[in-house]
From Swiss-Prot:
Chemical reaction(s) catalysed: holo-[cytochrome c] = apo-[cytochrome c] + heme b
Organismal lineage: Eukaryota, Fungi, Dikarya, Ascomycota, Saccharomycotina
Gene: CYC3
EC category name: lyase
The protein's name in its UniProt record: Holocytochrome-c synthase
Keywords: Heme, Iron, Lyase, Membrane, Metal-binding, Mitochondrion, Mitochondrion inner membrane, Repeat
A Pfam family matched in the record: Cyto_heme_lyase
Any one annotated GO CC term: mitochondrial inner membrane
Residue spans of the HRM repeats: 25-30, 39-44
Length: 264
């Protein structure tokens, strides 16, 4: 929502809090990352007369204008996330697109047809909620380093790769063909790669750590009937440190259970 695991995926489930139309993929095109803009990098179009930021090849201003033929007025207010942006505090927090920007992005990508306009605001809420959930999972992974440096991690950039199955997702789909009762048989509906800045110590710079997030649909919540999702978040297997962290992340609970420290 790839990591290689010997056990079943351990995925945290997040539940939608309002009615919405479930997208088949994230409608935001994260193929271009904003390394110099605090906004969620929504790719609108490639018109030749569009003014682009040369630092990230993104529009200088994302349209918040009402779309032609639009019937419902949508909010143009943007939500500020809890996710620190860039290398320093003065770069602030990442911002999410407004409902109007979300609709404009979908229309420009040809994904707006069939999406009720009155569902867009709920889609934005879910989009933001999933990103916040992913960040909380990353904070859990980074906690051991945060305790050492006393410096919170930050998000440098992120990109959407909905058409690229992670190795882990591909492996579980293959296992699902052999053991459908045990492993997932449906691919994730989206994938993001996030570049996280891990502190090397106060005033000692940052280390870039790539995280992979596979987003899965989950059975509706039994109590509320609302849609639910599973986020599988983990550091990419780019180096031995990430591989060690992934092994420890899963082996340590098993060790505690074997030692009788954790009961079923």
């Amino acid at each position: 929502m790839g990591w290689f695991w010997a056990d079943k995926p351990s995925q945290d489930t997040v539940k939608a809090t309002s009615s919405f139309t479930t997208p088949s993929a994230c409608p935001i095109d994260h193929s271009k990352l904003a390394s110099s803009s605090p906004t969620c990098p929504v790719k609108l179009n490639n018109d030749n007369d569009e003014v682009l930021n040369p630092l990230n090849n993104m529009p200088m201003a994302i349209s918040s204008e009402r779309a032609p033929g639009q019937r419902i007025k949508l909010s143009t207010e943007r939500t500020i996330s809890t996710i620190p942006r860039g290398e320093s505090e003065d770069q602030g927090l990442w911002e999410y697109p407004s409902p109007q920007q979300m609709l404009n992005a979908m229309l420009s990508k040809g994904k707006g047809d069939g999406v009720p306009e009155d569902a867009v605001e709920s889609m934005v809420e879910v989009h933001n909620f999933l990103n916040e959930g992913a960040w909380q999972q990353i904070l859990t992974w980074e906690d051991q380093y945060t305790q050492q440096t006393k410096v919170e991690p930050r998000l440098k950039k992120f990109t959407g790769r909905p058409h690229d199955l992670s190795p882990k997702a591909r492996m579980y789909l293959w296992l699902g063909q052999l053991f459908p009762e045990t492993f997932n048989t449906i691919p994730p509906f989206d994938r993001h790669d996030w570049t996280v800045l891990r502190s090397c110590g106060r005033n000692q710079g940052w280390k870039e750590v790539r995280y992979v997030i596979d987003y899965y649909g989950a059975p509706d919540d039994e109590e509320t009937g609302m849609p639910a999702f599973m986020l599988d978040t983990r550091p990419a297997l780019d180096n031995l440190t990430n591989a060690r962290d992934r092994f420890t992340h899963w082996a340590y609970p098993l060790w505690k259970k074997a030692m009788g420290e954790v009961r079923d």
